[in-house]
Amino acid sequence: MKRLASLSDDIKQYLVVTGNYWAFTLTDGALRMLVVLHFHALGYSPLSIAMLFLFYEIFGVVTNLVGGFLGARLGLNKTMNIGLAIQVIALLMLAVPAEWLTVVYVMIAQALSGIAKDLNKMSAKSSIKALVAAGQEGTLFKWVAVLTGSKNALKGVGFFLGGLLLTLLSFKGAMLLMAGVLTLVWCYSLYALKSDLGKAKNKPKFTDIFSKSRSINILSAARLFLFGARDVWF
């Protein structure tokens, strides 16, 4: 505890951001597997199950587009905490009787989860850039590499966690457990994250979401189609 207390404020903030991101990523991966397995058990066709994730991806793309704008306007602490809160709501929406879980209802819950995921991811990665001092690009790349690399590993762990929770608990029980744990993470985040983290001094305009560089805008559009193709294949 003494060693933790001796850390700089920036390192402490990085640990809070990383902890938030890890907790969220675990629940996100688990939720994906839980939805696939549970609705397969209910007799949903493969196409119907795929449709459940349609809004998740679409609303994630939209959030990705405007996330930086929101982060600069509101502060990255707020966008991260909003993302955590929305994920809790999405999980609680799915903790209802089975007869309520229609395709449209689950798609709406998944849309909220998609928004939450990209708010959380954007906030985590942007927060690191805000916490690293100017001229320390090596440290920035190292921290981002840890965060990004851990995402893929933890999402895989989340898949196994989802299957385990469905085996040990019911679908509803798994949703309630994850919502409860994430609520605790959210409450600590509200307390621990700086209120001015990543907040721009000058309010950006909405048009600032597009880069002034034509090359970057083209690259962004290409990535949109790339990830769209990946999700269709997956």
Where on the chain are the PLM-derived regions?
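Juxtamembrane intracellular "pre-TM" segments in multi-pass secondary transporters
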Residues: 1-11, 191-229
